[in-house]
Amino acid sequence: MNDQCVTVSGKQIVLTYAYLYEAADFALEQAINSEEGSFYNCLCSIVMNAFCIEAYVNHVGMDRLSDWDEYASPLDKLERVAKEVGIEIDYGKRPIQSMRIANKFRNSLAHGTTGVLPVSYSEKGQSERKVKRPRTQWEKTCTKRNAKRYLEDLKEVIQLIHKRYEFEWPAFGVLAHGFYVKQVNQ
């Protein structure tokens, strides 16, 4: 048995945005592969998507911009990072449009309130049918199709920004990187 004492020192850089992207992707895959709980998996995917873009622009801003304001709104941060490298922000067109929608979705849930929605309609037929329940805007947004589109657009936006800033590592596929030194103590 080796009783030597070893000291390990170094630095680990954890790419939070990469974890959030993986979480959004995993939740979407779960929604696609199983009807059971798919609404909740879509919800998680879209929320993680919104968290991811904010984490990514924080990553870029803190690394590349000297006067970064981490307390600005996520969309203001996105605009600032994009402007620095000549990327046009058009919230009326994909893929940027999806960043706005996902952020609005996230805000609806993060600052959620109990909603009261009016119900009034007439229908012919059997009275045993289920009542058509009205849905909030965030509930209407929470679909597999939307979650998939937002994730595709998120990836496109991040890759575009990443390429323009010429980072040394890929935007995706790496969750963390670092270096370590192991020293055997005598």
Q: What residue spans do the PLM features occupy?
A:
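Charged alpha-helical initiation segments
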Residues: 1-42, 178-186
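Short, solvent-exposed segments of well-ordered alpha helices
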Residues: 7-15, 32-47, 93-96, 100, ...
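Exposed alpha-helical structural elements
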Residues: 15-23, 76-80, 98, 153, ...
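Short, contiguous, well-structured surface segments enriched in hydrophobic/aromatic residues
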Residues: 22, 43-80
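Amphipathic alpha-helices that form helix-helix packing interfaces
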Residues: 24, 45, 49-56, 102, ...
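Short, flexible helix-adjacent loops and helix caps
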Residues: 29-36, 61, 65, 114
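Acidic/His metal-coordination segments adjacent to aromatic residues that form catalytic metal sites
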Residues: 83-92
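Charge-enriched, short contiguous segments at helix-coil
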Residues: 93-101, 105-174, 183-186
